[in-house]
Amino acid sequence: MRILFVAAECAPFAKVGGMGDVVGSLPKVLKALGHDVRIFMPYYGFLNSKLDIPAEPIWWGYAMFNHFAVYETQLPGSDVPLYLMGHPAFDPHRIYSGEDEDWRFTFFANGAAEFSWNYWKPQVIHCHDWHTGMIPVWMHQSPDISTVFTIHNLAYQGPWRWKLEKITWCPWYMQGDSTMAAALLYADRVNTVSPTYAQQIQTPTYGEKLEGLLSFISGKLSGILNGIDVDSYNPATDTRIVANCDRDTLDKRLNNKLALQKEMGLEVNPDRFLIGFVARLVEQKGIDLLLQILDRFLSYSDAQFVVLGTGERYYETQLWELATRYPGRMSTYLMYDEGLSRRIYAGSDAFLVPSRFEPCGITQMLALRYGSVPIVRRTGGLVDTVFHHDPRHAEGNGYCFDRYEPLDLYTCLVRAWESYQYQPQWQKLQQRGMAVDLSWKQSAIAYEQLYAEAIGLPIDVLQEA
């Protein structure tokens, strides 16, 4: 199949969230399965310093009264072509830059559509999140190009009807209430990044006011769990960690813990229970819940806690103050550093993901890969990847709690801390986590089926739904 990925992010060049990881990883696996896969994304001003292969101009197009150029390079470590849409609108040195995002990404989506009509015609356009939401609308009249739309985070829905009509000149009945809603209506197939999240977003609690529409199109809605790049994230070969190891050489992992304690200014002690937290410091990631119990947990236990991330100033201040109250026990780095995040995965005993909602989540999978036991709230993709430890039957790979309540999180942390004292059992738990297949292989096969279904659908998806 000829498949074109269209997205605002693509790792390792431009990444803010999990979408960048998907777009940077899945095409490689699909290419290995024999498909002609290509990627289309904006040519941001900061990309030149990151390109291994210089981008060469190959085509000039016209969209929404603006000329643009398309440049070609390659995704690193593969022969997947990467097309970059060049225009002054994408010159800012960050991906998301404020008030003009609605116009910028609608223009980008229109450019991708023009490229597909006039230069390289795919059988399937795989659209990602609201930035590409108008593509299924425009492709509605192209019977030989089908569309698949992936929801990475339903909370971000793009410009709403009044602004969308002004930007695109499409009549309101061809749009829905936002670019996200437009894509849900017109895409041949819609999927989320985990099976559980696909079910949850059809309810008022998680539906972000689109639960009615999502229930209506449930016949073409599915969930496919994300994978991770197991070649890049490999504790046996990762050059950014101190000691390489795998589940058969778990004793070497202690060197990573001791090095992390030293790097983060903690007491260097192999017996301390070290918990890692790497996330955006926003409510979605459960930081408000964590702050309600962290002081109490640290005063009750002898555990250590490390935080890496940036976000809302209020949460940053609270974490910083806690770190000053527990010197040698807690360390807060208000930044993002890819190398340090890997060292936290490799050196922590447990990894906390207490999300309010989580479409898929990648950090818990990276923690499993590196031997850090995840402690998670059962929601979205966390339900599909982390299973509660059952010592009696030697099952499970982490610790889970259900309700978004301080007591539930506190109890789960205490239970994990107490279990850590029994090292033979804890090491078996780590080994079970490291044995989980987290690669893209099974997910890629599921996407193959999704593309095949999209191509076989009647073009009038409203009647099909």
Swiss-Prot record:
Enzymatic class = transferase
> InterPro entries per the record?
Glyco_trans_1, GS/SS, Starch_synth_cat_dom
Instruction: Tell me if Glycoprotein is a UniProt keyword of this record.
Output: no
Give binding positions for ADP-alpha-D-glucose: K15
| Listed GO biological process terms | glycogen biosynthetic process
Q: What does this protein do?
A: Synthesizes alpha-1,4-glucan chains using ADP-glucose.
**What protein name does the entry list?**
Glycogen synthase
The species this protein belongs to is: Synechococcus sp. (strain ATCC 27144 / PCC 6301 / SAUG 1402/1) (Anacystis nidulans)
